[in-house]
């Protein structure tokens, strides 16, 4: 658990450092216009930057497998580890990493100063990760506190980290990633007309899909002993009550 508790905080600084050059350096060198004259769409250019950052995040996760295999072999008996739960935790880390990359790419598109891009990305990633949870902890919104908490990454990551993959959590991460890719596209396409209406329409569609997905969902308990699921006997008992 300590690995998966610490890793998001490492990502909080590592990923902005990886992504801060994405577009900021292009702006500083004056090559961004040249970049967009290539036979690629703006979306393809943004996604190529995004995928490049995501690949580096994947490589940064590989050394942590040593920790997993060490714990697995040193267990008593050997192999005494919840593989399903660990797999779920890695899914959560990957989703956080993918989200932070999209935030970092967006922040890099805002400025030509890499340091500014880094600082803004760190702040925004921190707010998305823990900010909403901190706001909800003050009970400012009453009955809406759970909704506010659900707007942040921390709530969804804790669910996945336990080894429970809920389509609502997956959809949340996909939505946040898509929104920041759209924000990046909007910033880089400000020179074009008709961008603003398309931006708002696409953003609204993404949010509506996420809202619909909160009502129709599936939940998968990856833990080997299904510790986060009701047993068949309990389900039968509750149905007969």
Please give the residue ranges for each predicted region.
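Transmembrane helix boundary and interhelical loop/hinge segments in multi-pass membrane proteins
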Residues: 18-36, 50
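Secretory targeting signals
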Residues: 5, 10, 48, 52-112
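Internal/C-terminal transmembrane anchor helices
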Residues: 193-216
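Hydrophobic/aromatic residues in alpha-helical transmembrane segments
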Residues: 15-19, 67, 103, 183-184, ...
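Terminal transmembrane helical anchor/hairpin motif
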Residues: 1, 117-187
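Juxtamembrane extramembrane loops of integral membrane proteins
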Residues: 208-241
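Long, hydrophobic alpha-helical segments
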Residues: 3-25
